[in-house]
Amino acid sequence: MNASTEFDTGPLSWVKNEIDLALERAANALNAYAESADLSHIQYCRTHLHQVQGALIIVGLDGVRQLTEALEALLEAMETGTVAANRANIALTYQGLQGIGSYLDALLAGQN
């Protein structure tokens, strides 16, 4: 990385545990929805994902923030019935949550 693209991992390291916790809670809410089909779990997932988005804004990770916005929009569409809250969309959301966590882990490990 050169100086113009180097990412300062300090701020991310300060909030990473909170991000991980919010991602875990979001995933747990998705799992709860898969077991019960109670749409309130989709709302809980969206709430936790919104917390992740806020932390990403603070640390300046706009690309990942855009992914959280897209996932949040998908969750909202599932919640309102605009998009089916089916296995495929739940799996897609779950993969997105895992991808966010993996990407942030890689950033902290010095990978880009």
Where are these predicted regions, by residue range?
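Structural secondary-structure packing elements that flank or coincide with functional cores
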Residues: 1-9, 82-112
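Long, amphipathic alpha-helical coiled-coil segments characteristic
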Residues: 3-48
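Generic structural signal for well-ordered, non-transmembrane alpha-helical segments
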Residues: 17-20, 24, 43, 50, ...
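Secondary-structure edge/capping motif, primarily at the C-terminal ends of alpha-helices
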Residues: 26-37, 56-59, 75-85, 104-107, ...
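Short, well-ordered alpha-helical segments
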Residues: 41-45, 58-74, 88-96
